[in-house]
Swiss-Prot record:
EC identifiers of the protein: 2.1.1.173, 2.1.1.264
Family: Belongs to the methyltransferase superfamily. RlmKL family.
A GO CC term assigned to this protein in UniProt: cytoplasm
Catalytic activity: guanosine(2445) in 23S rRNA + S-adenosyl-L-methionine = N(2)-methylguanosine(2445) in 23S rRNA + S-adenosyl-L-homocysteine + H(+); guanosine(2069) in 23S rRNA + S-adenosyl-L-methionine = N(2)-methylguanosine(2069) in 23S rRNA + S-adenosyl-L-homocysteine + H(+)
Domain THUMP: 46-157
One of the record's GO molecular function terms: RNA binding
Locations listed in the record: Cytoplasm
Lineage summary: Bacteria, Pseudomonadati, Pseudomonadota, Gammaproteobacteria, Pasteurellales
Native organism: Actinobacillus pleuropneumoniae serotype 3 (strain JL03)
Full protein name: Ribosomal RNA large subunit methyltransferase K/L
PROSITE patterns, alphabetized: THUMP, UPF0020
Name of the encoding gene: rlmL
Domain of life: Bacteria
């Protein structure tokens, strides 16, 4: 049993040095770090100890052959040449894990198949029964690693991966692997015998791993099936001694200094069961609670706060997370003075919302996500200092103060005006400060923060951090509930992709505008269903429509139609190519108790419908897109290039005393007055009259024209 053998322990990238230290402690092995793991030389007893006690290793492999191969024939020949009869009985099942490729073996499934063929053919040539492959519960796992022409064939002594401790029956959302959780604990700076608090513990993995460390419970103590059970080289007597020693080293006389909090009582129930399965239920105290009410369970001791808070892969989840991290940082400073904190997150920018300065940080992968763990020393402060800090936080939250002050100033000015106007949907901020390139809109009790795409010369990380800061400040200044703040990242739109669906929440509510009720949806589309900058245009159209036949072309959700109908239009006709938005317009009509018999809706290519129209209208509102190349349109559309073509068709259906209200959003649009004159039409630019107070900083957001027949 004193024979020294070199094994290989695999680990997640970045944890190799930690694993080396751990293996040296567990089995006094000679270790050499490699990419993705550690070569360690020890006895078979030492290998058993590593299997039982390692918290960081993913698998422990016993190399059988290390060689060079240049083709699948070389691979097959190598496998057939191994004396498998000395390794396992053909009556046992096996499975092949194949990792890596080269020029000849370009597919891991093909590589695994060739290995399987080699093993099966070996036994059949020796006159044995053909062994069976079992993907899920194999007795023997063969591991093959291929790097260019270098190949290592190993026996996987672990069986199932070692992160599968066996204590987790169920988990909450986004669970941590146990090996990663153990690494987070080891990197946190937590000292055994001191309190450990997880304020958002989820299924409890961090606390359970730490509690097992404290109690001396081997992570694999209760594992039933091992990859070496069917191995002919297995030494059962030695394994039994290693197992008995592990039971003896457990420490049952330790204080219960582990505390887990979570808002979700269902997840806490799972955490409690997991702790029971892991043998540490008596060491961990669980409590349901909101992070905003977090209190230090051991105020007279110094310990560590450890946490893997939620983080969103999609930006749309960010407002609530910004608020969560901001409040978390505040509670840490208020309740855990003098303590250490270690926070692990998949969105490093969110860690900045804690407003704490880290003294150490570590990178790690959680599945495909690049994550960051930051360690903090929470400075000790007197009660007076804490009170002063809380007051300072209350005053301006110390986040984006310039932005917060400008937003507060705008709110004071605009909300008074909005109340007088009888509107509850309006813009509060429109890129007033260059470093905060975004818009803030209010829709009743909801807020939309809409980021404009940053210029190419602006660092992406810096722009992202400013956005997070602005959202945090907006939450504070407006007092809006986090679930009523919507964040949109705006890119330059091409064609009709402004109508692409982003989500399917179906959260509609209505806003009011000069007596009209209009449905909006803040989450499912890039736009909300209501262009706020056209508010005065809609009001004007409504006033002009009284007693007239009205056409709304490129109607979007029909908001101008609502104003016209409410103001006494004789009839309205609404045309849009999008069935989604035409249905939206119908819902707007129903909301305002406007009957469909007087308010017709047509889903059609607007230009084609116009060419075929034989009716005449006294008032026409047309607000076409700047550019479109929709597959449902026969030709592309460019408002600068094609507006005279449009006017040619509109003149045909316009009554002699009729009016066209023409608007578009193209910056630098130039009206073709000569082309209009040839048609017998004249235009008046009224853009300045249709620009509301909340958009006065952006006079080029739209241009608007009154077009009539030239009087003889």
């Amino acid at each position: 049993m004193t024979t020294q053998i070199t094994y290989f322990a695999t680990a997640a990238r970045g944890f190799e040095e930690m694993l080396k230290t751990e293996l040296e402690q567990i089995c006094q092995a000679e270790c050499k770090v490699a990419q993705g793991g550690v070569h360690f030389t020890t006895t078979q007893r030492g290998a058993y100890q590593a299997l039982l006690h390692s918290r960081l290793a993913s698998r422990i492999l016993l190399p059988l052959v290390t060689t060079k191969i240049f083709s699948d024939l070389d691979l097959y020949a190598t496998i057939v040449g191994i004396n498998w009869a000395e390794i396992f009985d053909p009556r046992d099942t096996f499975f092949v894990d194949f990792n890596g490729t080269n020029r000849e073996i370009r597919n891991t499934q093909f590589g695994a198949m060739r290995v399987k063929d080699g093993v099966v053919d070996y036994f059949e040539r020796k006159g044995f029964a053909r062994p069976t492959v079992d993907k899920d519960h194999a007795d023997i796992r063969i591991h093959v690693y291929l790097d260019r022409e270098n190949m290592v064939v190993s026996l996987d002594l672990s069986g199932d991966a070692l992160h599968m401790r066996g204590y987790r029956e169920d988990t909450g959302k986004a669970p941590l692997r146990e090996t990663l959780a153990a690494a987070i604990v080891l990197r946190s700076g937590w000292q055994k015998g001191t309190p450990l608090v997880d304020p958002m513990c989820g299924s409890g993995t961090l606390l359970i791993e730490a509690a097992q460390m404290q109690a001396g419970i081997a992570p694999q103590l209760h594992r039933k099936h091992w990859g070496f059970n069917a191995w002919k080289g297995h030494q059962q007597a030695v394994w039994k001694e290693v197992l008995e020693q592990a039971y003896l080293q457990q420490n049952e006389e330790i204080q219960p200094l582990f505390f887990g909090f979570d808002l979700d009582h269902r997840v806490l129930a799972k955490a409690k069961q997991n702790a029971k399965n892991a043998g540490v239920a008596h060491l961990i105290q669980w409590q349901q609670g909101d992070i905003a009410a977090l209190k230090n369970p051991c105020p007279n001791q110094v310990g560590t706060v450890i946490c893997n808070p939620p983080y969103g892969e999609r930006l749309g989840t960010t407002p609530a997370l910004i608020a969560l991290y901001s409040v978390f940082g505040q509670r840490l400073k208020q309740q855990f003075s003098g303590w250490n904190a270690s926070i692990f997150s998949g969105e490093p920018e969110l860690l900045n919302c804690l407003r704490l300065r880290s003294h150490r940080q570590f990178k790690a992968k959680n599945g495909p996500l690049d994550c960051l763990q930051k360690n903090y020393q929470i400075s000790e402060r007197t009660a007076a200092e804490q009170q002063a800090d809380e007051l300072k936080f209350e005053q301006n939250a110390q986040v984006a103060p310039d932005f917060a002050n400008r937003l507060a100033k705008n709110i004071k000015k605009i909300e008074k005006w909005a109340k007088q106007q009888g509107i509850n949907a309006y813009r509060l901020y429109d890129a007033d400060l260059p470093e905060y390139n975004l818009a803030v809109d209010r829709y009743d009790d909801h807020i939309v923060v809409q980021e404009y795409a940053a210029p190419k010369n602006i660092d992406e990380q810096k722009a992202r951090q400013r956005l997070l800061d602005a959202v945090s400040a907006t939450l504070y200044v407006t007092g809006v509930e986090t679930n009523k703040l919507v964040l949109k990242v705006r890119q330059k739109q091409k064609g009709t992709n402004q109508y692409e669906k982003l989500a399917n929440k179906g959260d509609y509510f209505y806003v009011t505008e000069y007596g009209a009720k209009l449905w909006v949806n803040l989450t499912d589309y890039l736009d909300t269903g209501l262009f706020l900058d056209h508010r005065l245009t809609r009001k004007m159209v409504g006033q002009m429509a009284k007693g007239k036949t009205f056409l709304n072309l490129f109607a979007y959700t029909g908001s101008a139609t609502i104003h016209a109908a409410l103001n006494g239009a004789k009839s309205t006709t609404t045309v849009d190519m999008s069935n989604t938005y035409l249905n939206w317009a119908e819902q707007n009509l129903e909301l305002n108790n406007l009957p469909l018999r007087n308010n017709r809706l047509f889903q059609a290519d607007c230009l084609q419908w116009l060419a075929e129209c034989r009716e005449r209208f006294e008032l026409i509102f047309v607000d076409p897109p700047t550019f479109s190349n929709s597959k449902r349109m026969e030709d592309s559309w460019d408002v600068q290039r094609d507006h005279i073509k449009l006017m040619t068709q509109l003149k045909r259906i316009l009554t002699t005393d009729g009016t066209i209200v023409f608007s578009n959003n193209k910056r630098g649009f130039k009206m073709d007055f000569e082309g209009l004159a040839e048609l017998g039409l004249q235009a008046e630019n009224i853009s300045h009259k249709t620009l509301p107070l909340d958009f006065e900083r952006n006079p080029q957001i739209h241009n608007c024209w009154i077009i009539r027949h030239i009087e003889n």
